[in-house]
């Protein structure tokens, strides 16, 4: 099941969700929690679910673009430049991928920031023009909160794609790697 806007909005659980999950569990139906969230680690998402649902949640049942990055990209890189939250950077550091300055990185990963930085985006465009590999965690233009829709990291991705006439590979639900993760791991 999806999370943002389906199970909760911001820090508010949607009515009936806990009861539905309990019923599914009573009927031995395996539940995977899928999200395009690009600013929180899987453990942070697990903590949020446990807090909101007051239920135990298996972290291995949480699938995010960061899980796809860990599984399919991280072992191929020595270093990366992160455009995203501090939480995102902390998680990437746990994967033994060195976070470095943009100019010396092997690749760029676009996540979500609370406040976008135009100069940083222009520098990223310049590096990609010069051949730097780039990935994004998702292409969501917005994400739901209890205060309404907020700009997502897809807005930054779109700026880069439009400027360079390229298609940035997404590790999120709209990309090819997300569904292939489910196939590879026999998740149905």
Regions from the PLM with identified roles:
Residues 71, 75-96:
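Short, charged N-terminal beta->alpha structural module
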Residues 76, 169-188:
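Conserved Lys-Pro-Asp/Glu-containing loop-to-beta segment of HAD-superfamily phosphomonoesterases
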Residues 137-174:
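Glycine/Thr-rich beta-alpha phosphate-binding loop at enzyme active sites
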